[in-house]
Structures are given as structure tokens and as C-alpha cells.
Amino acid sequence: ILGRENMGMITGDSTINTEVPVICCTAEILANQALREGPASKVACVVMDEFHFYADPDRGWAWQVPLLTLPHTQFMLMSATLGDVTAIAASLEEHTGATCDLVVDAPRPVPLSYDYVTTSLEGTVELAMRGGEAPLYIVHFSQDAALATAQSLANFGIASKEQREAIKEAAKGTSFSTAFGKILKRLLGCGVGVHHAGMLPRYRLLVERLAQQGLLPVICGTDTLGVGINVPIHTVVLTALTKFDGYKMRRLRAREFHQIAGRAGRSGFDTEGMVIAEAPEHEIENAKLMAKAGDDPKKLRKIKKKKAPEGFV
């Protein structure tokens, strides 16, 4: 639309074409520039996505600093997961002296359906694949767990022969020289991707590119794919509804859940996206016991249900 000669990018990983009118950058890059230059900055307009991070205890400063230190800059603040923002607008007007105009969002183009299941993760994936619900993104809240699931699913015959051949061709030119790279190469050959912030950029970008081409039926990763990355996913599977936030185990906030779930449903491909939440392990085990007992009253009475582990939230 604007032409390559007018577009640049600055991230923590790379810098491309910086002396141009339009720069795409991370929130932290803009915040650091605002701290360096302050009101003297020549940034005329900022389109700030994922504005719900304004309240995040770790990254929120990067959304706050530009608003408070760039008084001559016009801002467009966007979020797909905020509710009533009247109070936020009033607070911004109070702190910046600028007028805030509210734009109500349009309905979601691809509606979502939700399911809460007590099947094992492998069983859930198998049912989803059989039901034509691929591609799947399986969300974990640790990098090790994502890799463990990927290695487990790689033996399930996830990809077709045609997909495996296309993946092999598309991955040509990528160096898999590291220990993790060798593991990833094997997983990709089975149609299973891995995606998290701890990966080298070349591996992460390859997984995103393969997903965009529709070659990966399953991606196992963390909630990083829910932020700022455009990858077509039909079904999101959450392995848990709790996470460790650096201080304690807690339930996902509504915003976090909707941010992750919002990746389901491919515009232009799907009439509906699917979001599946896995029950905790003790609930899954109890469901197995109930199913095994069937309708037999004696067997049902003898069931000793597993309790939630200590500290479970």
C-alpha cells in the first residue's frame, strides 16, 4: 500500500530501513526513544496495538511512557480485548491534557465456539484432527512443556506425505546446526511446530512461515503466539487455565484468555473458530474412572476421586 521505500522496522532482533516515514517497532523501542528525546521527538503519529498491556506489571511501562512524554504526538490506541474503556479515556485526558475519541469495535469477523474437555491432550488432538479442526495451536505456559508435547505428538502421524514433502522443501536454506535445531527439524518433518520466545529468531520465523503457508497441522508453543503475530490457526487448545506469573500460580485473566483464544478462526478460510480448554489432570483422571464405571451404581459408589494437588488454583 505505502511501498517498501516508505516502510521500516526496528525490533530487538533486527533493524531495517530506519530513515523512512513509517516505522514498525516494538512498544519498548518506542518507549526508549521517548525517554531519550521526550517532547523534542519528531514522532508525529503512533498506532499502538495491544493497548491492554498498559496495565501489565512487567511490560506496561512501554505503553505508558510514550503517552506521558510525547505531548505533541497523536496516538491511536487499539485493543481487541478491552471492554468499556470510558474510564481509561478519562484518565488519559486527565494525565495528558489531550482529547480522547472512542471508536467502538466491529463484531468479530469469524465467531468462536468454546469447549471444555476432560479427555487427555493426545485424545483431544486426535479428535480435533479427525473432525477437520486443524491447524491447531496448543498453548502451554512453559517452554519445556511445549517441547515435550511436540515430541509426544510427533509420533502420531500428524502430517500427510504431501505436507511433509512441502515442509522439507520450504525449510531448505535454514540452518539447523544447534541441538534444538536438530530436534526442531525432526519435529517439523512430522508436521509439528514449536513456537516460543526462547527460540532463535530464524527458527521462530520458519515456524511462522510454514504455518502461514498452511503446512503445519499442529504447533506447540507458549502464549507468545497470542501477541502481535499473524499466523492462521483454526483451533486453539489451552493445556491449562492457570499459569505461573513470576510470583505465584493464578488463573488466567479474562483479557489473557481472550487474547489467546482470539487467534482461533482464520479470516477468509473459516466460518467459525474453535477454542478448547483442557481440564486439570485430576479432573481428567476422575472422568476416566467415571467412564470405566459406566452406569453401574456399585462401581460408581466405589470410585475414589482424585483430589486437586496442594496449592491448586
Q: Predicted segments — roles?
A:
Residues I29-A31, F51-A55, G193, G226, ...:
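Catalytic acidic motif of RecA-like/P-loop NTPases
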Residues S14, V65-G157, R186-A197:
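Conserved interdomain linker/interface between the two RecA-like ATPase lobes of SF2 helicase motors
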Residues Q74, V231, T235-D296, L300:
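Conserved segment of the helicase C-terminal RecA-like domain
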Residues I1-N32, A90-E93, D101-L102, K185, ...:
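Conserved nucleic-acid-binding Ia/Ib motif block in the N-terminal RecA-like helicase ATPase lobe
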Residues N6, E19-V22, K42-C45, H72-M76, ...:
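Loop/turn-to-beta-strand initiation segments
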Residues T18-L35, C190-N230:
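Conserved two-lobed SF2 helicase motor
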Residues I23, A27-M76:
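SF2 helicase catalytic motif II
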Residues I1-G8, D144-V218, G246-R255:
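Conserved C-terminal RecA-like helicase domain
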